[in-house]
């Protein structure tokens, strides 16, 4: 018996004393798929064009070794997934096409993503998708689907339609439902006079996109709101209220991004209410630092509260958990590993709570037991369960994964040269 296994057996007994079955927790963890986002790997560049980022998005940093091709990106992704327990999904944006053809966003077809599907099959992964409504010449005056010019709207409507066909292709080929998430940056920098008309245009554009029947067995649509962005500080067309109304009346998933609300708001407090009314939920787990900064996810209070809400209320079955952060100041493979493993840790920690005992205490008004038990749980040997889970999934335990990443950085990343005059420091 290894030391890891021995510690697990001891921890198993400890948790059994409070009616927690660690074996059942490990089985549940095996069913949790995290949708890891591709754009951390290349600073949201993609392979459609060399245009700079726009749409209120910024990436800072110039850490060496950034992926410059789909092949390099997949190489980095394979390294990251090899250090993360379980089988998961990869979340693609439309700008991550892999083709020799020169095509625009309104011309994309499933064939332009065939290499990704082949790779996903080889690695036992699912794929999710996102139409890309930013960093493009047709992103005009801060608007896309809500632009007053019908020609601009038509371009983006066609892109939205094609994205749904691509997502359906992913689901059909891989046997896993592909979530297709819609986020548009449309908005005004300064105070508008007319807040209603742009929202009418956005609603009409979305209705046109979704007019085509797509098999929900293969793909489902999600709608993502945002409080503000760079260049849309005063008004965002796709607000939380807009997409709550739209999603609930059109049977779409509602996407909650941890950084897309006021700094004093938390999405953990929204999950229970939304679960009562919606078809389902998509989460973009992120870490906002004073604004939607998309820092790498850490094991902070809000991440743990999100996990508790999902587990305590049995919401994992109707919630798709995705990540959304990008940091070019650190090793990009390490960023993926840290963020994904932390999200898994938070979910496991929530599963190791005696939820039924706590709910019963709360129901009868025994708040003393509720407080005492939740506090004592903080000293329980959660790490021993996590380490055993990693051991059983044949991935590094503790900081051992960092040694792998550092070796990868020494051997692989130096072979990648930045184009002359370019770096990874991008602002918009």
Swiss-Prot record:
Keyword list, A-Z: Cytoplasm, Isomerase, Manganese, Metal-binding, Rhamnose metabolism
PANTHER family membership: L-RHAMNOSE ISOMERASE (PTHR30268:SF0)
Cellular compartments annotated: Cytoplasm
GO cellular component, one term: cytoplasm
Domain of life: Bacteria
One biological process term in Gene Ontology: rhamnose catabolic process
Pathway listed: Carbohydrate degradation; L-rhamnose degradation; glycerone phosphate from L-rhamnose: step 1/3
Gene3D superfamilies given in the database record: Divalent-metal-dependent TIM barrel enzymes (3.20.20.150)
Principal subcellular localization: cytoplasm
Record family assignment: Belongs to the rhamnose isomerase family.
Catalytic activity: L-rhamnopyranose = L-rhamnulose
Matching InterPro entries: L-rhamnose_isomerase, Rhamnose_isomerase, Xyl_isomerase-like_sf
This protein's name: L-rhamnose isomerase
Cofactor note: Binds 1 Mn(2+) ion per subunit.
Task of the protein: Catalyzes the interconversion of L-rhamnose and L-rhamnulose.
Record EC number: 5.3.1.14
Residues reported to bind Mn(2+): 260, 292, 294
Cofactor section: Mn(2+)
One Gene Ontology molecular-function label: manganese ion binding
């Amino acid at each position: 018996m290894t030391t890891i296994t021995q510690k697990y057996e001891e921890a198993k007994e400890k948790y059994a004393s409070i009616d927690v079955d660690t074996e059942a927790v490990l089985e549940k963890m095996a069913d949790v798929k995290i949708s890891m986002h591709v754009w951390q790997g290349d600073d949201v560049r993609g392979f459609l064009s060399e245009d700079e980022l726009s749409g209120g998005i910024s990436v800072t940093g110039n850490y060496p070794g950034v992926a410059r091709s789909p092949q390099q990106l997949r190489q980095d992704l394979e390294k990251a997934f090899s250090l993360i327990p379980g089988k998961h999904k990869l979340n693609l944006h439309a700008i991550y096409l892999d083709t020799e053809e020169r095509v625009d966003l309104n011309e994309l077809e499933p064939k332009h993503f065939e290499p990704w599907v082949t790779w996903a099959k080889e690695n036992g992964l699912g794929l999710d998708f996102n139409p890309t409504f930013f960093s493009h010449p047709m992103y005009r005056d801060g608007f896309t689907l809500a632009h007053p010019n019908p020609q601009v709207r038509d371009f983006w409507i066609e892109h939205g339609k094609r994205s749904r066909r691509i997502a359906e292709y992913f689901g059909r080929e891989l046997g896993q439902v592909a979530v297709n998430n819609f986020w548009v940056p449309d908005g005004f920098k300064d105070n508008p006079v007319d807040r209603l008309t742009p929202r009418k245009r956005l609603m009409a554009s979305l209705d046109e996109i979704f007019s085509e029947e797509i098999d929900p067995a293969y793909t489902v649509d999600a709608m993502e709101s945002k409080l503000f962005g760079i260049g849309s500080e005063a008004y965002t067309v796709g607000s939380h209220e807009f997409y709550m109304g739209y999603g609930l009346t059109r049977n779409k998933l509602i996407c909650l991004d941890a950084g897309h609300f006021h700094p004093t708001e938390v999405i953990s407090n929204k999950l229970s209410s939304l679960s009562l009314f919606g078809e389902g939920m998509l989460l973009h787990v992120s870490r906002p630092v004073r604004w939607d900064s998309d820092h790498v996810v850490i094991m902070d209070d809000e991440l743990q509260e999100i996990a508790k809400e999902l587990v305590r209320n049995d919401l994992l079955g109707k919630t798709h958990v995705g990540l959304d952060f990008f940091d070019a100041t650190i090793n990009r493979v390490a960023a993926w590993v840290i963020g994904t493993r932390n999200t898994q840790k938070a979910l496991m920690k929530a599963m190791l709570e005696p939820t039924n005992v706590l709910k019963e205490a709360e129901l009868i008004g025994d708040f003393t037991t509720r407080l005492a038990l939740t506090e004592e749980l903080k000293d329980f040997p959660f790490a021993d369960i996590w380490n055993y889970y990693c051991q059983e999934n044949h991935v590094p335990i503790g900081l051992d994964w960092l040694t792998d990443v550092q070796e990868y950085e020494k051997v692989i990343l130096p072979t990648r040269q930045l184009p002359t005059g370019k770096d990874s420091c991008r602002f918009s």
